[in-house]
Amino acid sequence: MEELETSLFQTRKAHRIEQMVARWLRRSRDSSARAKVAAADGPARNPTQTLIPVRHTVKIDKDTLLQDYGFHISESLPLTVVAVTAGGSAHGKLFPGDQILQMNNEPAEDLSWERAVDILREAEDSLSITVVRCTSGVPKSSFLTEEKRARLKTNPVKVHFAEEVLISGHSQGNSLLCMPNVLKLYLENGQTKAFKFEANTTVKDIILTVKEKLSIRSIEYFALALEEQYSISRLHLLHEEELIQQVVEREESHDYRCLFRVCFVPKDPLDLLKEDPVAFEYLYLQSCSDVLQERFAVEMKCSSALRLAALHIQERIYACAQPQKISLKYIEKDWGIENFISPTLLRNMKGKDIKKAISFHMKRNQNLLEPRQKQLISAAQLRLNYLQILGELKTYGGRIFNATLMLQDRESYIALLVGAKYGISQVINSKLNIMSTLAEFANISRVELTEESEKVSVVKVYLQDVKVLTLLLESNSAKDLACLIAGYYRLLVDPVTSIFLWPGNKQQAHRVSAEEGYESRACSDSEESSEVDCVLEPLSDRRLVKLAPCRSLIKEEQPPGNSPTPEVARRGPSTCGASSTTDSAESEASDSANTESRGYRTSGSSESMDALEEDDLDTCSSSRSTFFHFGSPGLAESIDSDSQEERSGIETSGFLCLLDLAQRANPQCQKTEFSESAALETFGWAPELSTVRLDPRLYEGSHADYYSLCSSVSPASYLSDSSESTASRQGGAPPAWGQQGWTEAQPSSMLEPLALHPPLAFEDGSSDEEYYDAADKLTPPGPPSGPRDVSTAEPSATSLQNKASTSSPENSLPCGPDGRQPSRRGGVKKYAKTLRKRRSFLQTDYTSQVSFPLVPSASLESVDDVCYYDREPYLALGAPSPTVSSLQDMQGEPGLLETKALGLLAPLRETKSTNPASRVMEMEPETMETKSVIDSRVSSISAIRFRIDPNNKENSGVVPAASSSASTPHCSNPGSSGPDTAQARPSQILPLSQDLDGIAPKEPTIEHGDSSFSLSSGDPNPDRACLASNPGLNNVSQGDTLELQLEPHVQLEMGLESFCTNHIQETAPKYTEPLLSPRDEPRSDECGINPGEKIASIPTKEEPQGQLSLERDREVTNKNGTNVFQEESRKDSGDSPGDVSNNVSQTLDISSPAGKIVTSLSLDAPVTGTEQIPPHPPRDPQGQSREPPGQGCQAQEQKLFVELDLDPDFFLGKQTVSPAVPPEGIKAEAPNHVTGQDIAPRDSPEWVCFNPEPSLPEPLPCPQEDPHLETSNHCLLSEGKSDSSSICLSAEKSFLCFAPESHPEVSASLRVATSLGFAGMNEMVAPRIGMDQCSCQFSYATCFRGPQPETEEEDRDLEAHPMAPLTSPPSAGSPVVLPWRPARAHSCTTAPLSRKSHIWPEYCSRALRQLKATPASTPEGFIQLMESLLELQDILETSWGVGNKHPPEKCTWHFTESRSRLCMGSQKLLSSCRHVIRMDQSPEEMQGAVRDTFQHLVQLAGLCFQFTDCSRCSARHREAAGNLRDVVYTYHQFIEAAKSTCERGYHDLSVKLLARQCTALTAAVFCLTQKFRASTAL
């Protein structure tokens, strides 16, 4: 019976199914028949596509947050709505495709797109818009039509959806998912999609297909990730080039789910909302899901989770158009509270508490609106606020990796945080949110992933200065880190450049880019493929020619392990000719540093050759601006056939000689590299060249475009239009390089004004990698390059220009009419904004401008081309002596100072200083050994001075300060080349300033009032050179003393351009040339002037200020053996105090021509006079007491310290100072503020010009307090292309000549410590992706450990969070030695003074003078200190900086300088603070230590005050201003604690409080400097 019922039931069921199928078939036939009849009746009739136009008029309110109406209109007519912002004002009112009829009662048919945009902008609060909406009577067909099928044939889809969509992971039983080659992809919106993939389907193909389906525009934020089944917090990224087949075939693949996620979180979600509302909504849904799944549970606080839940609930209410006052009971019953609150929170909190908290937060969220805003908060605002709250979590906006940092001699276990906000940062203190930036994405050139073992991999992050971050991680984490860095690089720097190449598939055929073939197909099931796709698609399979310098280097062999690229290169006729041999190698050789594949390592640094190679390629390829070729099959053979010839001549090739030069300059490096590279033929590039890595931009095999860094060929925007397809590529014949550089004028469209700086490759053979471990006091393994090496290397530099390109003219085609490089489509990767930025920071809106010096010379006198301002100040010492080895790295490598002694220095006087060199003092004040450094160094502040007096008594032994060749036509006195004018050795001169922008040299003119006269080399009366025409200026001394004071170590410690690590006056100046060369009979008041520049100086009589003399460390002998500088401290005799003058120190920039030198000198030109003298006295020595020759080096160091608010410690060790001893003799002050924007002839030998950058448009008045000086305190301003500011001196004040109340405004541009714009290259980097301000709120106790023995603390601090970055990108910025040095130097006119400029020096002078005059008793000292501190706080509250600007392209240089100075200054401040908390000292000693701390604080503030701004760094400087105020406030508390300790004695409580305040100050200083942490801090 039961069987009968069962059988009957099955029969009925089958019958019902048959009936249903029959009914469906019958309906299908009927509909098809009706369709045929309709088609026969009229072809236009189609019942399935009936369009019903409906007219709608809607009123849209402007979104107060986004300031827009939430929709976008088409640029073409008729005006239609193309997009509606999700959650915006127009959401639900307008729809894509609506045709606009009226906007604010204006008919749209008469409107252009521009006018429509204007109407939208002019509409204040609301917009009335009438649209026509075409609605279809029936749903769109999802079946493929013939039309769609035809489109798909021309535009094939690479990824196919499976036949069903899974909801929440549940399948309806379709067996398709059990078939092979199907990937289930889980979306964050709850959907699951199934993809059928092929053997060559990649991750990128899947992503692009999902992009179509979801209509996402900003796909660069997305990636595929594998989520572990049992640990949802572990997500592993997939590289876009990975094959899906390989991913699915992994053994552990069954334990993972594949997710489509926003893996690269934007810095500001508002940017994403404006850019792509769909992607923003996806990110919001993903974030909500992550919160509910507790991905951020480690960081998330309960209050934050509840607030997010309230926002989520409100967003749902608004999005679902629910009534505003909906009860939580309804939400809990209808929606479920578990959909908004994480399970852990539900378990741990009572339901009543949860409801109460959510109600509170929902009310609070209403306050997001402005008080007078009437409209309700929108869903978009709630979503935005939700994401902004989440953005405060480090694990949301970044990802933490535990890695082992591989240093040279040790390993360091660190926690890395990688994210858009943080770059690559090291987490120092997670609780206090203290991080140190190791690298920014914009500074990364390449990422490599190497498998060390089955479970461990190595990630190498190559930075622009050829520094490598080597990180050891677990294999999955290593891959995630590499993919994350590459993804953020694409997102933030260059969307078309992949810096992480997937090693698996190098021979892939051309792949469609993210935009190619998919851009317009936004509708579901690919049913709306655009016609543009059909047009573009045939080109996608067509190989596009790469634009690149195609030169045959060495015909290399394919190394094992690298898949060859000749097949790729030869696939078609468009390939660049030698791509299979040359181009790929060139791209790889130049790619920063591939030392592992190259097979050799330098002895002390793995990256020294890499620095040279990559810069050589940068320089060569960028210099040959028109060297592009259209590749053809014949070209490959022709170039290959020439390769043997090339091999023989490769040593002299212009393309390679830079590397040769650098290798010769470092013989040890050369020996190691060539011995380790067995495959090298003639040159050390073969292994590198044979390393073929397939750059994603180089799928077509034309790898040479890796380095088509055409010099200013075209804006990068010309390269970035991915929709423009140009199948042909145009090139130009290479310019010939003549003996003296480029002899042909380049087309203006092809070249910017030539960059006058030496090639970057001329760098120290020892890389910065040697300096990883400053705290460990490593010494560089090899001796620095000596002058002999440089001289041998120089012919190669000459041969570089002699050797023309080997490419024959027939292989090149003319360039485009405007010199523009044709853009490339997405498949052939284009360059876009960044043209492979490296250490030279070549990211500009234009392509790089790296060119060779215009005046190369094979003589030793021009060897200074090889000097590199930052790392190589000693490379070109002019004598075959050992050099001062490691004073060059300006970021502070203290241990490096102990390496080499100076060989040929003049006999050194035993120094009484027991302090280490300033670099040692900066970095490790009490832990460094100092003897070898001090004994072998030159004086920290050494003056070169020569007297110019009528009797020529003191000129015989004087060494002029810098070089100015007598043969140079623009020298002041061309004929003066007497025995006393020793030539300045090129070794002391550093590379050329970038500021030399071709301004024609002029004769310097001095103008005053109505009278003016010019200073030329042929001036019959050179005595007038330093005199004004005003007859009242009569205080000129007859024995004018011009002192050029070099402070190289000060410059170094300040992080400046290491002006002259070896001073100009050091050693016997065998090669010096006269800079300010007097005639054979020098005139009394002549200032040596370079006529190419402008000089204006007025001697002034000074009040007695107790000029201080100080001891010299050594003597300097000239080439004849005479004692030029007696370095003894002498007491002055015979001069009344009234004859004593104060000094004004002034920074002069000595620039040399075309790739020569720039040296910054500090010019101390003291001026006094005892008698009234006619304005232009010919020669009248009467009344002037000249110094004896032994006094010639009477230095002004103590005055410099006093006037610049620096104690001798801030310089290179303490100098003994006689505070009350005035200098003997009267010095005529000739402070020459000179400008020289142009250079002497291009072919001239070395010469120097003064080149300060900031300048005064007009003179300024100098109020006087001494009646004798009323008419003598004016100086003249010489007007020129670069307005130079002149300096005059005042009476009375040691630093200022006016009181603030008399002149509240001081010219902002009158800073003698000028900004050089000292550049070795043009550079512009992407805006620094910095970290947020330190989130320490109040207590800094846990930031650092308390006081410990100082040696341990110094070492620990330097290792854990070094105050000074261990390396830096090339810097140029403002080489200002000290803040506001010329506070008492003013120009003289009636222009109002700007308080902003001189308020700081005035304060410094007064505060420090008052402190020095304060009695030693504790109460008075602290009271005075408190007053000064309060004044400092007032200054910081009311003003900030001088307001000077620097060009954006030099922002990186200035940032490097700011960072270096801040790190050095903060280190000194913290070091002095540690002296205060010592237990074993008397109150008087403590107060002395406190005074030192205040002095260092003033110095630190001064460093911050002198920042210059641009659009890129102004925000960072504003933040630094706030942090500086925090430092001063914390310091105030520190001083109060110190005062309390002094008054109450050293009780435990007071000492603990003092130590705690010291710790707080340390953290505050750290917060100040953390924003300036170098992107290459390791």
Curated annotation (Swiss-Prot):
Residues 1100-1117 have a biased composition (Basic and acidic residues). The keyword Cytoplasm applies. Residues 181-496 form the FERM domain. InterPro entries: Band_41_domain (IPR019749), FAK1-like_FERM_C (IPR049385), FERM/acyl-CoA-bd_prot_sf (IPR014352), FERM_2 (IPR035963), FERM_central (IPR019748), FERM_domain (IPR000299), FRMPD1/3/4_FERM_C (IPR041779), PDZ (IPR001478). The keyword Transferase does not apply. Pfam families: FERM_C_FAK1, FERM_M, PDZ. Residues 730-742 have a biased composition (Low complexity). It is found in: Cytoplasm, Cytosol; Cell membrane. This is FERM and PDZ domain-containing protein 1. It comes from Homo sapiens (Human).
